[in-house]
Amino acid sequence: KRLLDTIGQMIIEQGFEKIGINAVSAQSGVSKILIYRYFNSIDGLIAAYIRKHDFWLNTSFEFSDTVQMLPAIKEMFYKHIERLRTDPVLRKLYRWELSCNNDIIASLREQREKVGMNLIEQVCTLSGRPKQEIAALSAIITASTTYLAMLGDYCPVFNGIIIDEDNGWKQIYKEVVNLLDILFAN
């Protein structure tokens, strides 16, 4: 826990540029040997932090019936958006994930994909909608909101929407809900 807290704090304060095994060891008070033993590398430690804080890897949404399915989907996307908006470390970690490709990142992506496909299967089974349709809409919503949350750290306005303020995100979420309502109304 101390290592994960330390890595999160270091990412907030310094970004990834100054994160190395020596700096993490010094700041956390945990020996390099223990870091290597439990995480194999600095990337392994960062991946453990992502696994602990990632929305999709820690979601437990179950869609049990068609009546509750749509409200649950809306809640799921709302929680995803709010998590991204309120967790600057997670946004930085997603940027890091996009900038490299290794076995640790591949494993994280595979785990996230399994969770996503499970959710898609549940929605398809309950709604009778084609898998391609649900998967594409989910990809569009998830990718676009993730991108906008990451962009909001550097660019306050996108397509005239103020993405570094609550009102802009209320507008975005409202249209996510409208998309979902249109899809499931047919």
Task: Label the predicted regions.
Residues 45-53, 105-108:
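Alpha-helical DNA-contacting segments of helix-turn-helix folds
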Residues 123-177:
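Hydrophobic/aromatic-rich alpha-helical bundle segments in the mid-to-C-terminal region
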Residues 84-106, 152-158:
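Amphipathic alpha-helical segments used for helix-helix packing
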Residues 52, 56, 83, 87, ...:
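Phosphate/oxyanion-binding loops and surfaces in catalytic or ligand/nucleic-acid-binding neighborhoods
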Residues 49-76, 116-122:
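Amphipathic alpha-helical linker/stalk segments
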Residues 57-62, 101-128, 135-136, 169-177:
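Amphipathic alpha-helical packing segments from all-alpha helical-bundle domains
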Residues 61-90, 126-141:
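Hydrophobic alpha-helical connector segments
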Residues 2, 6, 10-44, 48:
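Helix-turn-helix
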